[in-house]
């Protein structure tokens, strides 16, 4: 069932947490209407700081607030957060292990018509390489709220990757997030599809297509990219013998890379990755772009069948 965009759930979660924790502060870089931090800003204007189009400075301010005992959520589009402010995230937040939550929206191809300059497809790779950084890609609104709640209680840097478009509901409303723990959305024993973000819903749909052909596909929501759920990956490799990863992100160093690192060291099995290749995005509708770059349930099902043949 189609639910809210993860960015909408983010705004709601901030407002709810702001009511119970006066140490939570929110920063934005002139995009609060889009990131939905304006929901928090209207409720708690004295705890909201718009730094303007100066993302690096925003991260520095967030680091200072964290050093003073606050719990800052620094928000902007993924391309500006992970891209423009990378040095400040690395040196001012991760190096001293400060309690800053970098919460970005408008990630991946589903930014749509804004085109390649705004379609961040490399941020998971960049962020999971940073020491002390936890990287999370929630699949839906319920999981987003659970992740924000967890992040507010956890001490340390966290990168939370959210999207622009509405997405299907996957997790139950009472879902509890734990880092390094995945969620099995569909059980199966012929092949495992490991996905994150909006691709989880597409993987679930692909599993339905495969079921019609008598193929039992397991679907794992791997929202915690770092730390990753090694146990679930190795269990899936042992029980299904084939792993397919799906992400709205480059296959170079993202979810697919993280899963491959686990498999090659501990349990090599046939594996394939679905995501963008060595390319930028382009302008177009979200649906058209997902179709062009192979990020559809139909393509996932096709790749799963090809992968099974390699077992």
Language-model features, listed with the residues they occupy:
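Thiamine diphosphate
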Residues: 1-161, 166, ...
């Amino acid at each position: 069932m189609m639910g809210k965009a993860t960015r909408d759930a983010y705004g709601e979660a901030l407002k709810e947490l702001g009511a119970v924790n006066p140490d939570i502060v929110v920063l934005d870089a002139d995009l609060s209407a889009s990131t939905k931090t304006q929901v928090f800003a209207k409720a708690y204007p004295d705890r909201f700081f718009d730094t303007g189009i100066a993302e690096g400075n925003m991260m520095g301010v967030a680091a200072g607030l964290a050093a003073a005992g606050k719990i800052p959520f620094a928000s902007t589009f993924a391309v500006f957060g992970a891209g423009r402010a990378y040095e400040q995230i690395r040196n001012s937040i991760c190096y001293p292990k400060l309690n800053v939550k970098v919460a970005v929206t408008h990630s991946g191809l589903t930014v749509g018509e804004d085109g390649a300059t705004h379609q961040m497809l490399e941020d998971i790779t960049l962020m999971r390489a940073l020491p002390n950084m936890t990287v999370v890609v929630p699949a839906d609104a319920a999981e987003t709220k659970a992740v924000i709640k967890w992040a507010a209680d956890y001490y340390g840097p966290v990168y939370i990757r959210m999207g622009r478009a509405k997405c299907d509901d996957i997790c139950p409303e009472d879902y509890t997030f734990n880092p390094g723990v995945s969620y099995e959305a569909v059980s199966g024993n012929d092949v495992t599809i490991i996905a994150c973000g909006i691709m989880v819903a597409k993987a679930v749909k692909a599993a339905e297509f495969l079921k019609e052909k008598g193929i039992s596909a397991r679907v794992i929501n791997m929202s915690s990219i770092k730390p990753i759920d090694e146990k679930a990956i190795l269990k899936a490799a042992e029980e299904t013998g084939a792993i397919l990863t799906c992400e709205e992100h480059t296959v170079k160093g993202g979810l697919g890379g993280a899963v491959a690192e686990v498999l090659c060291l501990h349990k090599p099995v046939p594996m394939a990755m679905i995501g963008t290749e060595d390319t930028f995005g382009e302008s177009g509708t979200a649906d058209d772009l997902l179709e062009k770059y192979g990020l559809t349930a139909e393509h996932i099902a096709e790749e799963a069948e090809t992968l099974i043949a390699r077992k």
